[in-house]
Amino acid sequence: MTEASSGPAAKYPLTPSVMHALEVSKRGCDELLIEAEWLQKLARSEATGVPLRIKLGLDPTAPDIHIGHTVVLNKLRQLQDLGHQVIFLIGDFTSTIGDPSGRNSTRPPLTREQIEANAQTYYRQASLVLDPARTEIRYNSEWCDPLGARGMIQLAAKYTVARMMERDDFTKRFRSGIPISVHEFLYPLMQGYDSVALKSDLELGGTDQKFNLLVGRELQKEYGQEPQCILTMPLLVGLDGVEKMSKSKGNYVGVTEAPNEMFGKLMSISDDLMWQYFTLLSFRPLAEIDLMKQEIAAGRNPRDCKVLLAQEIVARFHSQADAEKALEDFNHRARGGVPDDIPAVSLSGAPLGIAQLLKQANLVPSTSEANRNIEQGGVKIDGATVSDKAVKVAAGTYVVQVGKRRFARVTLA
């Protein structure tokens, strides 16, 4: 889907601050469409003093977010710091349809109650990044519910099946004989109509959302509006350095995780992956990051830079004091020590199987995970590695460790 530019007609001066705003906008992005239009929107905003309206649509299909989700949120915050207004759009209507983006099957819809509960949790966590004073929260049921059958049909008439089939996921499913429900064609139309209702100047999304974002741009033209620009952000690679960050893959860092856990996970990433994290997650100037690369090439230990990254992210979601304490505890553990503030857990049922003990102490989510850690030599009791899954632990108080970062002082009766 390509097109000619049809953005702001008037020319405004491209001042140094406007060019800086463009640089901030493009940092780490996958694609900015159409750059010349966005540049003129930025220039107009500076000349007139009217903030631009920047939209992020969210279908809250899960309640908790990880730092991979914050890649887009960080970009929004950077644009807020330039003086622009963010519209945090809750897709309570579109979530009842189910977004087909990137799917090879139909996505099950959610109830309004599930959506609202997830949305509240998501926004509470997103507020750790966004500036609430420059964030407008909207629900797309405000304009989608009143459409009714007549309005929905009129909207559907503005797009063809051929245009819909330009989407890769629809094409793949069609060629593979996998059913595509008619209601799935409505999803990108409804997301696009959100842009019309909000009169957005820019819409952000992941690379998998590009088609939907372009539909919004086309619909704005149909309704006589200046079309929004589009900025897509890459998907953050997970801790394993291979696949995108995902809870299902276990390669994620949750934004509500404890400071020590968050810090330790970030310190575990590879030196090469560190640079993507700096670009997409850090607010440090690119010039400073480039200087770090030069210093490492000249012999500086990459660990020093990784510490700065981990501290910055922990401080963002907790506090600077928590970040400093997490570094102290990390160094202590690296020397073979035990953190000072490990949780104390009281259990009963001695003698208790080691897998059950680990699960009941909340050191692992399941006994199968406990057994996996034992097999890999990742479980210690009072510093001694446990290698036998059949071990039963007698009554007493022990320091139990799983992996490098999970500790508990367990009293078993």
Curated annotation (Swiss-Prot):
Residues annotated as domain S4 RNA-binding: 352-412
Principal location class: cytoplasm
Keyword terms of this UniProt record: Aminoacyl-tRNA synthetase, ATP-binding, Cytoplasm, Ligase, Nucleotide-binding, Protein biosynthesis, RNA-binding
Compartments, as annotated in UniProt: Cytoplasm
Residue positions of motif 'KMSKS' region: 244-248
Catalytic activities: tRNA(Tyr) + L-tyrosine + ATP = L-tyrosyl-tRNA(Tyr) + AMP + diphosphate + H(+)
Entry binding sites for ATP: 247
GO BP term, pick one: tyrosyl-tRNA aminoacylation
Motif ('HIGH' region): 60-69
Gene3D superfamilies in the record: HUPs, RNA-binding S4 domain, Tyrosyl-Transfer RNA Synthetase
Molecular function terms, GO-annotated: ATP binding; RNA binding; tyrosine-tRNA ligase activity
Top-level division of the source organism's lineage: Bacteria
E.C. numbers: 6.1.1.1
Record-linked NCBIfam families: tyrS
PANTHER family, per the entry: TYROSINE--TRNA LIGASE (PTHR11766:SF1), TYROSYL-TRNA SYNTHETASE (PTHR11766)
Functional description taken from the UniProt entry: Catalyzes the attachment of tyrosine to tRNA(Tyr) in a two-step reaction: tyrosine is first activated by ATP to form Tyr-AMP and then transferred to the acceptor end of tRNA(Tyr).
Entry protein name: Tyrosine--tRNA ligase
Native species: Cupriavidus pinatubonensis (strain JMP 134 / LMG 1197) (Cupriavidus necator (strain JMP 134))
Origin organism lineage: Bacteria, Pseudomonadati, Pseudomonadota, Betaproteobacteria, Burkholderiales
